[in-house]
Amino acid sequence: MAENNNNNGDNMNNDNHQQPPSYSQLPPMASSNPQLRNYWIEQMETVSDFKNRQLPLARIKKIMKADPDVHMVSAEAPIIFAKACEMFIVDLTMRSWLKAEENKRHTLQKSDISNAVASSFTYDFLLDVVPKDESIATADPGFVAMPHPDGGGVPQYYYPPGVVMGTPMVGSGMYAPSQAWPAAAGDGEDDAEDNGGNGGGN
């Protein structure tokens, strides 16, 4: 019996040892570039090191409390946000630097950040926040400039329908067919039947 306990103790020690991260755990696009891959492997190995931080916790807590729904913030939450923000900044900077190197420049520019955001599905949530680089629109005739919905001076750029990668188009339709769901009660279908059919044509 004592021998079994010894084996269990050995197994527990082995289970507590972190395995190096596999490539499947890395963020998208990180495995294609050696610099990004090495950065994320290093971050995953040192993810428990929250003592050294660059961003002020008081400022992060103030931003969190700006939301009217947030009443209290635990002491650990700003620390985790600080680490996440640092990782976000470094990753986006690396991706932007790669864009600067592609253009044979040694200075990081706003256009490099815009290009890094536009070329990464990870950062597509920033497309409305980061101004688009005007040179992208002139270099790629597929881009269509649309006025900003808020009336701002910076236009948004979109590819015409059928050009954007994603769900394939079927036939001449705009979207792939979706599954038909039964109608819910009170959605107006009963009214159409009472009026003699589909509600519009005879």
Swiss-Prot record:
Positions of region (Disordered): 1-29, 180-202
Cited SUPFAM superfamilies: Histone-fold
Annotated compartments: Nucleus
Superkingdom as given in the UniProt entry: Eukaryota
Disulfide bonds: none
Function comment: Stimulates the transcription of various genes by recognizing and binding to a CCAAT motif in promoters.
Designated name of the protein: Nuclear transcription factor Y subunit C-6
Species for this entry: Arabidopsis thaliana (Mouse-ear cress)
